Amino acid sequence: GMRIARGADELPEAYAQARAEAKASFTSDEVYIEKYLENPRHVEMQVLADKYGNVVHLGERDCSMQRKNQKVLEETPCPALNDEQRKKIGKIVTDAMKKLGYSNVGTIEFLYENGQFYFIEMNTRLQVEHPITEMVTGIDLVREQIRVAAGAHLNYTQDDIHFDGHAMECRINAEDPFTFVPWPGKITQWHAPGGLWTRVDSGMYTGYTVPPYYDSMIAKLIVFGKTRNGCLMRL
């Protein structure tokens, strides 16, 4: 279990309770103490690196809208960051990847609150939400992943990366709309949206039976707009 201490006076009791609970449950009273963030955003940075020390970042994504600690809507750029913050965290991330000697695509995830970034983890792969980065940069991340894995050099530097407009992704899940419990079954009618600056990634079709064995996500709706408001209207 976890305990929150919002002041020094609350720490001794919370610490004792956490130790006692850990001891009773796991026969060890060791506990881990870290800073508690009241209302953070979930912000992640997309990086791309080749095998020759060349690294670029492709901007950030805001993945704060979640249910059951799972992302449901993502957008780029993050509306909470300014250009200075974006440039600063971008340099930190690319410098770190160079020092690590990392190669291929990767995503570095942070919690962000009150102007400060707190590292969570790095995913050494593409993310579900990578299409919105493709929308605003014009870079095909799947293609680049294959190229650098095959030993190719990056064809551009950070100065060549330009961000245009705003993009959002909405995950479509086969779930009960009230309980969010996975809801497998036959799709009686499927009509995917389309049009300018609209993309749907899915394998669904009318008559398809959604199986009960996998994740409930069955489609991704990705939209682009010149502004955030335009993007929201299209979504």
Question: Where is each model-derived feature located?
Answer:
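ATP-dependent carboxylate activation and anion-phosphoryl transfer catalytic cores
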Residues: 4-235
